[in-house]
Amino acid sequence: MGRKWVASVAVGASAWLGLALGFGCASNAPKPLYDRLGGEQMIQVVVEDFVGRASGDPRVNFTRKGTPQQWDPTPDNVEKLEKHLVEFLDAAAGGSQEYRGRDMKSVHAGMQITNTEFDAIEADMESSLSKFDVPAQERSEVMAIIEGTRKDIVELK
């Protein structure tokens, strides 16, 4: 009887210790990028600044003037674009939103975006992230998400 009791205590103590250590490890796990960015509100603020910045950047050709996919930046169109960008970044950063837009390749087809224009877009996003004091690690992760879309967006080298 004594040995069974000692064995039971040892097993129970081991289980509690394992749980305690497991919970300790879980709390040290890095938060998703979404949380580290400040959630949807911060993503929304950065996206709004980015759209304003990129639309005024002549290196970007934001309206795609002179291409088969020229875009009219009406208030409704800008609102839709911002909504899709927020959804995309939210989902890519581990947030709860689902991106409901079309895939990057089909939505940018015919826009004739060049690598130089894409580089300018990245610079504008980097500036918007910096404006709101997004830390370097998180900026780097967002920029990796953006860079990951290059192959689907750039049509003209």
Model segments located where?
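Bacterial N-terminal signal peptides that target proteins for export
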Residues: 1-16
